[in-house]
Amino acid sequence: MEKTKNKKQSQWAEVFRMLRKNRMAMLGLIILIILVLLALFADLIANYDTIVIKQNLAERLMPPSGKHWLGTDEFGRDIFARLIHGARVSLKVGILAISISVVVGGILGAISGYFGGLIDNAIMRVVDIFLAVPSILLAIAIVSALGPSMLNLMISISVSYVPNFARIVRASVLSIRDQEFIEAAKAIGASNSRIIMKHIIPNSLAPVIVQGTLGVAGAILSTAGLSFIGLGIQPPAPEWGSMLSGGRQYLRYAWWVTTFPGVAIMITILSLNLLGDGLRDALDPRLKQ
């Protein structure tokens, strides 16, 4: 058991070593850390009530300057302040939604792959039904039924991603369920639930970690898209998609109102994709070839 533990530790140490050698992945990680720090300390940088949501029509649509680094929007609110508070919303929704998807999808996929037979067929047919519907349409349908709010937004996005993680975990489980350490656990009388939770799921984490990173990027993009059409975070709360939607009518003569929220979305998605690609290469170097 001790040898197995040490082997796993050395494997993860090798993964981190390879990740550090990937410059693009490290760039993505650094950008992501900066975004997270800005989101965490947003209240210290810009007061929410007096700067982020309070209107100041005397300074509406001001271009970038020393006073307002990224300019102001149609209500005179500082765009930089709203962007960093919006980062908190986007990252929170993206990370929590994908975390829920990983847990639910992982359990369903592990049960399906481990037991097989009728259980596998039943779970996979339900998964196929959900996969037949585009994830953004499924999210729109759920939010439309439940109403726009942050909680409902997270629920809708997490439900739309559960089938993806269920299939990924199932595929991993099918490749390891007949290996010697699983048979050894069965031989000593370990219960099915213990085998799934202690042996199956931990050994299926590599593809889940990669897909989870890319999934957060997709969830942030879905959040922005739903907010853009009025089904996500509601004004005056800052959210990148709603900022894009509110500023599109001023694009011709106040380009900064929509440009900077768009750039924030692009940078965040790019950093997550770079990190996800780096994790994929580190966890399975064969995929690089």
Residue spans for each PLM region:
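Generic hydrophobic transmembrane alpha-helix motif, especially the helices
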Residues: W69, D73, I79, I100-G105, ...
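Signature of the 12-TM Major Facilitator Superfamily
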Residues: M26-I30, A122, S193, M197, ...
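Transmembrane alpha-helix boundary and packing residues in multipass membrane permease domains
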Residues: L35, A110, A139-S144, L153, ...
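Gly/Trp-centered helix-boundary motif
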Residues: M1-G106, A110-I111, G117-L118, A132, ...
